[in-house]
Every structure is written in C-alpha cells, then in structure tokens.
Amino acid sequence: MGVQRLALALIAFTSALTSVIAAPIVIEQPPLGPEHRYDAIVIGGGPSGLSALSSLGRVRRHVLLFDEGIYRNGATRHIHDMLTNDGVEPKVFRAKARQQISRYTSTSIKDVKVTKIKKVFEHGGRKYFFQVTDKTGAMYTASKVVLGTGVLDVLPGTPGLQENFGKGIYWCPWCDGWEHRDQPLGILGPLRHVMDSVYELETLNNDIIAFVNGTEHSVEDILYLNRKYPHWRQQLKHYNVQINNKMVSSIDRLQDGSKHQDKKTWQEFDKFRVNFNDGTSVERSVFITNFPTEQHSDLPDQLGLARDPIHKNKIKVNFKGMRASVPGVFVVGDANNDGSTNGNHAMFSGKRAAVALHVELEQERAEAALGKRDESFSAEQVENEALKLIGRDTEELEELWGRK
C-alpha cells in the first residue's frame, strides 16, 4: 500500500509540474532603457559575479554585470589553488573570463559603480522588479539581482601594513602559503586567533612568532581560547610558537618577493622588519593576518538584507540557492555567510545562485502566464510543496522502490 500511495503522489506531482512547464515561455528582449528589464543584474566583477554572469549567459538570460574595479585579491601577485589557473595574475584571470563570457551575446558588462538599488512593487504588490542606479545617474531595471560585492579587510593603521598587504602579508594559507613555505613567519592579530593559524600553517612553517599587539593577557581572548582549545597553552609549546606581546609601531619591507623568487620551486622571498614601540625590532619573511572584514558595499543594507546572527559582517543566505532574506536577491562570494572565502568558493556560489535564479524566474513566469503568480511564489516553495506531496525523505523512497 505504501508503494501505491507513493506512486499516486508522484503522478499527482508530475501532473502539476507538467502543467507549469507547458505554460507559454515568456522571453524578455534586451533592454533599451529604464522601462525595459533585464532578467538579472549582477553587481560585482570578481570570480563570483563573473561565474553567475557566465552561467546565466549560457541559458540565454539577458544579464548586465556592473564592475567598479575594486577586488579583494587585487593586491595579490597571483591566484593559487584554482585548477587550470594556478599562478595566474588576478587581472589576467578576470580578462580571460570576460573574453570567454563575451560569446554569450545576451550578457553585457559596464565598468561603473552602482550607488543605489531598490525593490519596486507593482500590480498591487503582487509583482516586483529592481531598480539600479550607477554613479553617473543612469538607471536600469531587472527581475532579479545577484550581489557579488565582496568584503573589505579592516586593517589597523600600522604604517607598512596596508602598503604591503597581499605581497608577503596574506590572510589565506591556501592562496599564498606554499610560496612562502619553510620561511620564518609571523602571525598578526589578537591572541584568540593564534591557534587557528598555527593549525593551518604547521605543515608549511615551523618558525612562528605571534605578534598579538598587547592582547596576550586579554581576559576575553583567554576565555575564548579556553573554550575552543582547552589545551592551547600546551599546544603552543608543542609547536614551539612564540608569543610577542609588544605593541607594533610599523612594518618595513626589506626585500620584495616579486623580485626575489625561485620560479622552479615557486618560492617567493619577501623580508620584513617589525618595529615595536620600545625601539626594538624583529625580522620575518612572511605574515598571516587575523583581522576582521566588513561588507565592501552598502547595497545589501539599502535592500534591508538580513545579516548572519553570529557573523554580522556577512549577509545571511539560504545555502541551497544563495537566496538572501529579500525575495529576488541572491548574494554570492565572500559577502555571504556560507562559511568559505576563496576563489573556488566564489565561483561555486555564483554558479549555484545562477541556476536557482534561472529556474525560479522561469517558474514565476510560467505561473504568471497561468494567472497564478503571487509574491510568495518561489523555487524554494515548489521544493517544499513537492516534499509535502510525496511525504517521504530520500532514503525512504529508495527503500520503498527497492521492495518487490
């Protein structure tokens, strides 16, 4: 009987889905002005935004991408740990991506900053679109929006830190650690984050000094470490990590790894001097940083997007489709809260959002053609309704179908 009920449920669901798919296809033409809409507008020209643009272009969505020309990895020498692009300069990667995407003629790119964005309701609030304004005052509209606006690293004002960030001073071991392996390393940041970096770097560097800048005796940091790593003091001794609690006054570059490198081994040999307030100094070849980030753009706040309750510098998304709290908005790359910040993740999230957006948009248009469209309709709603209709999880379904 269970199999029969399941079969009937599947037939009913298939029938309902077929009625939607059979609806007339509504294709919007390329926009000619503010009164015409794009299928989607993507804001951000890094890996996540370009990935979304590419995926949407491949299904002939009319999409416009805005790129203001500021990138988190803009200062880094090369991209690493990205298959087929290991060692490529970030600007070369972006140029190649643009060239390849250009074959999808329903896509376009504008190199200008977006300053305003708002959601506009129409038809009594049952439908909506997004209005985007760039810094020249030009307006554009779209059915959906993808934000790949990224984050900013909030660096202290220590002289020499900002100027050298991304070149021998990095925040991601996978992005730059291999090129500085087996070199004297410094950890820059509060005490609470030292163990995280030690665990990440132990296979690459074993001469480590943590420059905690006066936080060694911070009660808050110590309590945090006691909770997260109960044996952290013993672990630091085990790894022979030194804690330097002096206040850092400046960092001087002594050698540039872009000029001193071994191209056969892919090693870069930077060298720095850390100067302290007491007049003493220490030399290191490379640094990893543990400083906070913040949203690069205020566009998420203009739309009223919810933040992650714990990591408040991140925009909360539904990981299944990168949907933000406002229907029609997708947030990809470092800006969202799905827990990873690197180029591979950025492209994955852009791809996932593009697929969800494409399907959601077509489902909405099919429903509109049938006169059933309402503001609450979404791809996620369809998924939930399908689960209710079937009433079984995946493992139960496999077990039922396996019975004779």
From Swiss-Prot:
Self-association and partners: Homodimer.
Residues with attached carbohydrate: N213
Keyword Glycoprotein appears in the UniProt entry: yes
Chain positions recorded as FAD binding sites: 67-75, 334-343
UniProt similarity note: Belongs to the class-II pyridine nucleotide-disulfide oxidoreductase family.
Superkingdom: Eukaryota
Protein name per the record: Probable thioredoxin reductase ARB_06224
Cofactor note: Binds 1 FAD per subunit.
PANTHER family with a match to the protein in the record: THIOREDOXIN REDUCTASE 1-RELATED-RELATED
EC number: 1.8.1.9
Endpoints of the signal sequence: 1-22
Source organism per UniProt: Arthroderma benhamiae (strain ATCC MYA-4681 / CBS 112371) (Trichophyton mentagrophytes)
Catalytic activity: [thioredoxin]-dithiol + NADP(+) = [thioredoxin]-disulfide + NADPH + H(+)
The organism's taxonomic lineage, starting at the top: Eukaryota, Fungi, Dikarya, Ascomycota, Pezizomycotina
